[in-house]
C-alpha cells in the first residue's frame, strides 16, 4: 500500500509546508462557499431543489380547436368522411379533426368566430362560448365518454 496517506506517516505536516500553513480558514480560501466568485474555482452547482414542479396529474396535453375552424372545414371534412352528414346538419368528432388529436390527453373546443352550420360535436371539453355558439345554431355539444371516465378516476 504505497498510497499518499501511507507515505506521509511520520511526517508532521503531510506535505503542507510548515506547521503554520494549514491554520485557519484563510489558508483554505474561506469557509464553505466563500469566495466562489473571486477565486478560480469553477462550476459550483447550486445545491438543493428550487422552483416549482407541477403535479403530474394536472399536466395534461390539451389539443384545441375553435368553432370557426370547424365551420370553415366542414365541406372538406364531409368529403373526407371525417364529418358525417345527418338530417339536421353534421356530426363531427373533434379528435379526428385536430392534428395529433388521438395522442392528446384532452381535446377542447373553444368558441371564437361565427358558426353557420348545425353541428353535433363530440369532444372531451368545451368552453362556455363554444357551447353557446353550437347550441345557438341548433347543434349539440357532446362531452365524450372518454372524458367522463377520466373525471371519475
From Swiss-Prot:
Q: How does it assemble?
A: Part of the 50S ribosomal subunit.
Q: Give GO BP annotations, semicolon-separated.
A: translation
**Protein family per UniProt:** Belongs to the universal ribosomal protein uL15 family.
Which InterPro entries does its entry note? Answer: Rbsml_uL15_N, Ribosomal_uL15, Ribosomal_uL15/eL18, Ribosomal_uL15/eL18_sf, Ribosomal_uL15_CS
User: Where are the annotated segments for Disordered?
Assistant: 1-60
Q: Where is the composition biased (Basic residues)?
A: 1-40
- The protein's organism comes out as Halobacterium salinarum (strain ATCC 700922 / JCM 11081 / NRC-1)
State the function annotated in the UniProt record. Answer: Binds to the 23S rRNA.
Q: Provide the alphabetized UniProt keywords.
A: Ribonucleoprotein, Ribosomal protein, RNA-binding, rRNA-binding
Which GO molecular-function terms appear in the entry?
rRNA binding; structural constituent of ribosome
A single GO CC term for this protein reads:
cytosolic large ribosomal subunit
Residue stretches spanning the membrane: none
- The answer, when asked if Hydrolase is one of the entry's keywords, is no
Q: Which residues form the signal peptide?
A: none
Is Transmembrane tagged as a keyword? no
Please state what the protein is called: Large ribosomal subunit protein uL15
Entries under HAMAP family matching the protein: Ribosomal_uL15
Q: Where is the composition biased (Basic and acidic residues)?
A: 41-60
